[in-house]
């Protein structure tokens, strides 16, 4: 049977799905290059240390013939950090990319383990200018892909980082708390604060409710937290939102937004739509990533778009075509 079945999380694309996802990738890539982004292609296989200091259970690992531990890339941003640190690429610079990334999903939820992405990285430019360009190009890319209804949701990585650094948790405790926050598990968070009391107890217990219209979330958060670093992060998000008022009609915030990648250090954002349960675009600031590769800190922001999720968001609006195999939709 292994000759005709696929590994868990792998899927064939046929007919309309194959054609439209190709067109989305092509059109967004062409648009970004026309906007001055330099195309970059990075290898599918990398040394595992590019992405983590230890073996991650959700990465695909393999040994080459010399016994070196390699990984199928789980994201492209870390690879671009390696490129900046190891070559003579001059900054500031802007990159665009598209290609496959791989994540091993332990849970059998029908999730894809091979993902098609397109994205950008803006490196070395003034922070405010870079943030605005990143969000503008994200919106333009979604519009180009004909996504009709979507919402930008903002947060700031320093909020949870400040709390975690103060609590000094071991890796298991930190993972458990982040899981409670991600799932908005009020009981779990409450029990955690009872066992590990801190100055952030009230804020943590309120986190499952700190999402919705941006100004309401900001106002409520400022009522229950007095930590200077968190307040500065809230101010940073508010300033960005003011700058985006002409571009985005409505914005939301979720202060319990757990960053998709560990390297985010500042503003983070995700984009959600009505027809897709998870975010189909995510991004943020990651100024300190380059230190991982022995380079100096650089202002940096980027985003990645899940092409297959964008297809799910628009495919009901597309005309049918020949071919009836289920995975071809």
From Swiss-Prot:
Pfam families: tRNA-synt_His (PF13393). Required for the first step of histidine biosynthesis. May allow the feedback regulation of ATP phosphoribosyltransferase activity by histidine. Gene3D superfamilies: Bira Bifunctional Protein, Domain 2 (3.30.930.10). Keywords: Amino-acid biosynthesis, Cytoplasm, Histidine biosynthesis. The gene is hisZ. This is ATP phosphoribosyltransferase regulatory subunit. It comes from Streptococcus gordonii (strain Challis / ATCC 35105 / BCRC 15272 / CH1 / DL1 / V288). Heteromultimer composed of HisG and HisZ subunits. This function is generally fulfilled by the C-terminal part of HisG, which is missing in some bacteria such as this one. GO terms for biological process: histidyl-tRNA aminoacylation; L-histidine biosynthetic process. Pathway: Amino-acid biosynthesis; L-histidine biosynthesis; L-histidine from 5-phospho-alpha-D-ribose 1-diphosphate: step 1/9.
């Amino acid at each position: 049977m292994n000759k005709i079945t696929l590994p868990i999380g792998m899927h064939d694309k046929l007919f309309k799905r194959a054609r439209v996802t190709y067109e989305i990738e092509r059109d967004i890539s062409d648009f970004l290059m026309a906007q001055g982004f330099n195309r970059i292609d990075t290898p599918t296989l990398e040394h595992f240390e590019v992405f983590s200091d230890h073996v991650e259970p959700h990465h695909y690992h393999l040994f080459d013939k010399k016994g070196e531990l390699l990984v199928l890339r789980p994201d492209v941003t870390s690879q671009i950090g390696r490129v900046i640190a190891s070559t003579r690429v001059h900054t500031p610079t802007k990159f665009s990319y598209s290609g496959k990334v791989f994540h091993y999903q332990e849970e059998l939820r029908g999730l894809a383990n091979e993902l098609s992405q397109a994205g950008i990285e803006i490196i070395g430019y003034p922070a405010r200018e870079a943030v605005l360009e990143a969000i503008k190009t994200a919106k333009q890319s979604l519009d180009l892909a004909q996504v009709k209804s979507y919402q930008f949701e903002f947060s700031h990585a320093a909020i949870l980082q400040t709390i975690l650094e103060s609590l000094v948790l071991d890796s298991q405790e930190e993972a458990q708390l982040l899981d409670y926050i991600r799932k908005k598990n009020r009981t779990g968070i409450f029990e955690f604060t009872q066992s590990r009391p801190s100055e952030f107890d009230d804020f943590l217990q309120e986190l499952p409710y700190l999402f919705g219209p941006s100004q309401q979330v900001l106002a409520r958060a400022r009522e229950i937290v007095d930590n200077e670093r968190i307040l500065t992060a809230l101010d940073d998000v508010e300033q960005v939102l003011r700058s985006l008022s002409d571009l985005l009609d409505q914005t939301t915030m979720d202060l319990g937004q757990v960053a998709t990648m560990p390297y985010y250090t500042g503003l983070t954002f995700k984009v959600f739509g009505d027809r897709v349960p998870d975010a189909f675009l995510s991004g943020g600031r990651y100024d300190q990533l380059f230190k991982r590769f022995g380079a100096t800190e650089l202002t940096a922001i980027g985003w990645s778009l899940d092409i297959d999720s964008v297809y799910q968001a628009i495919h009901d609006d597309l005309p049918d075509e020949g071919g009836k195999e289920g995975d071809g939709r």
